[in-house]
From Swiss-Prot:
This is Proline--tRNA ligase. Catalyzes the attachment of proline to tRNA(Pro) in a two-step reaction: proline is first activated by ATP to form Pro-AMP and then transferred to the acceptor end of tRNA(Pro). As ProRS can inadvertently accommodate and process non-cognate amino acids such as alanine and cysteine, to avoid such errors it has two additional distinct editing activities against alanine. One activity is designated as 'pretransfer' editing and involves the tRNA(Pro)-independent hydrolysis of activated Ala-AMP. One of its GO terms (cellular component) is cytosol. It is an enzyme of class 6 (ligase). Its EC number is 6.1.1.15. One of its GO terms (molecular function) is aminoacyl-tRNA deacylase activity. The lineage of its organism: Bacteria, Pseudomonadati, Pseudomonadota, Gammaproteobacteria, Legionellales. The keyword Aminoacyl-tRNA synthetase applies.
Length: 564
């Protein structure tokens, strides 16, 4: 491809709203243009990269035995109402009405549609197993779209859905997709980790995310420094405390604490360590009641763990001060488990405390030297805290370390979550009707492009991993418009490279060499060849790899050998 026949839309200016390097570089390299908040046009250069990623995804899905189809973007409200997600999905679901006042939505995902297909088309166990996938535009009405295509409202996604007769078959399909995802991200040249994850709005019982490691990632990846354990911090388990709780020493005592509202203030007032106090958080129950969650003073609540607790509302909702005062008689800064008039759940680490401090459920008063069972019944105990870097890994091997990650894919074991609600069944070999066992598997194709840039760039621009590069070779002539020899040599080499199967971008613009070099570095083409009069005099071409700082001279007759 010659630049004169291509749309090269590089710019020097960085948009004011572009914070991440990937967003800045995708705009400057002419890959994207913003249409509206969270909506982007993929220009020809960007589309080439997007299609490269989609091609790798498609090849590996086909290799894994999945079958491609294409479902509508617009979906009937009735399907989402049937699954129970019409209201539960929240404001990210863009709801619309047609001219006949029928409700629809722009699909953020396609579990309902594929389950509807399955219940209509699948009748017998003999048709199983099956796995369908599509690569298609999705829409989620993000409250605050940001970071370019990293968190946009419209995006390209690969979503797949497996159907099996039983749980064993579903697990086998899950493992097959898990392995396919590993191959996809390995082929794309990304540094990634597969981590245990929460199932979120999709649902199901078991899930992994695929996280591209990058300092700007929104997710915290937790991993052991001595084992294969890895999880999103939302899912990371805190190891249960070891040993028996020691016996109490001091007598419980109420102290006046005027103005004390936080653990730090209590620690300063009572001269105690934060880890010797407990904090009490009030959340809403699933039947309008209130429930207290009690943690050690130096720990933070893991909202995802909490909202999966029996009796706790999903999604998690904190009670406001008015509700707390009506139920307990004090403000949020004076709460504690002693004589608490509502049910409470204690974190496992807080349950090990001896002679601890807590609110007295009376404004401006706290208890010190409180002990479980002696002064207050322990009640329910669960793992509800966020893990802390340096914690012992839950598998007992090594310590937990943290890294930042960008989620580019997730796989789920759905079981019969959708098939049961939508009555998707098949008849087994005994003639018995059974609910289909499902899995679903997503890859953010457009987000993967941005994540790759976050891992692969420098001060000059993008450094594409080879499988994602829009072109393989940049051919840059020096003063071609003044030199017949340079033009002729370029024409000959360009045709040889094309005939050899390489994707070449020939910069045939009437521009200064520095401008052309800067543009080729910015758009990140892996290999650059420079042809000049002085080089031709010596029978050489200058070769430079994008990821290298040094150029080298290559014989004009042996240029193709560089790429073999």
């Amino acid at each position: 491809m010659k630049v004169s026949q291509f749309f090269l839309a590089t710019v020097k200016e960085t948009p004011a709203d572009a914070v991440l390097a990937s967003h800045q570089l995708m705009i400057r390299a002419g890959m994207l243009r913003k249409l509206a908040s969270g909506l982007y046009t993929w220009l020809p250069l960007g589309l080439r990269v997007l299609q490269k990623v989609a091609d790798v995804v498609r090849e590996e899905m086909n290799r894994a035995g999945a079958l491609e189809l294409l479902m509508p973007i617009v979906q009937p409200a009735s399907l989402w109402q049937e699954s129970g997600r019409w209201e539960a999905y929240g404001a990210e679901l863009l709801r619309i009405m047609d001219r006949h006042q029928n409700g629809f939505c722009f699909g953020p995902t396609h579990e309902e549609v594929i389950t509807d297909i399955a219940r209509q088309e699948l009748k017998s166990y003999k048709q199983l197993p099956l796995n369908f996938y599509q690569i298609q535009t999705k829409f989620r009405d993000e409250i605050r779209p940001r970071f370019g295509v990293m968190r946009s409202r419209e995006f390209l996604m690969k979503d797949a859905y497996s159907f099996d007769l039983d749980e064993k078959g579903m697990q086998a399909a899950y493992e097959k997709m898990f392995d396919a995802y590993r191959r996809i991200f390995t082929r794309l040249g990304l540094n990634f980790r597969a981590v245990l994850a929460d199932t979120g709005a999709i649902g199901g019982d078991y899930s992994h995310e695929f996280q591209v490691l990058a300092d700007v990632g929104e997710d915290t990846v937790v991993y052991s420094d001595e084992s294969d354990y890895a999880a999103n911090i939302e899912k990371a388990a805190a190891q249960a405390p070891q040993g028996e709780r020691v016996k109490p020493v001091a007598e419980m005592k109420k102290i006046a604490t005027p103005g004390v509202r936080t653990i730090k203030q209590l620690a300063d007032k009572a001269n105690i360590l934060p880890e010797k106090g407990v904090k009490t958080l009030i959340v809403k129950g699933d039947e309008s009641s209130l429930i207290a969650l009690i943690l050690r003073g130096d720990h933070e609540l893991n909202d995802v763990k909490a909202q999966h607790l029996p009796g706790v509302a999903f999604p998690l909702q904190f009670a406001d001060e008015k509700e707390i005062r009506e139920a307990i008689g004090c403000g949020p800064g004076s709460l504690g488990p002693v004589n608490l008039p509502i049910p409470f759940i204690v974190d496992r680490d807080a349950a090990q405390l001896v002679d601890f401090s807590c609110g007295a459920n009376e404004d401006d008063f706290h208890w010190i030297n409180v002990n479980w069972e002696r002064d207050v019944p322990l009640g329910s105990v669960a793992d509800i805290r966020k893990v802390v870097e340096g914690d012992i890994s839950p598998d007992g091997k090594g310590r937990l370390r943290f890294a930042r990650g960008i989620e580019v894919g997730q796989v789920f074991q759905l079981g019969d979550k959708y098939s049961r609600k939508m009555n998707a069944t098949v008849v087994d070999e005994l003639g018995k009707s059974r609910y289909l066992q499902m899995g679903c598997y997503g890859i953010g194709v457009s987000r993967t492009v941005a994540a790759a840039i976050e891992q692969n760039h420098d001060e000059r621009g993008i450094i594409w991993p080879m499988p994602m590069a829009p072109f393989f070779i940049a051919l840059v002539p020096v003063n071609m418009h003044k030199s017949y020899r340079v033009r002729e040599a370029c024409e000959k080499l360009y045709n040889e490279l094309i005939d050899a199967g390489y994707e070449v971008l020939w910069d045939d613009r009437k521009e200064r060499p520095g401008v052309m070099f800067a543009d080729m570095d910015l758009i990140g083409i892996p290999h650059r060849l420079v042809i000049s009069e002085s080089g031709l005099d010596r029978g050489i071409v200058e070769y430079k790899a994008r990821k290298s700082k040094e150029a080298e001279n290559v014989s004009l007759e042996n240029v193709l050998s560089v790429f073999r």
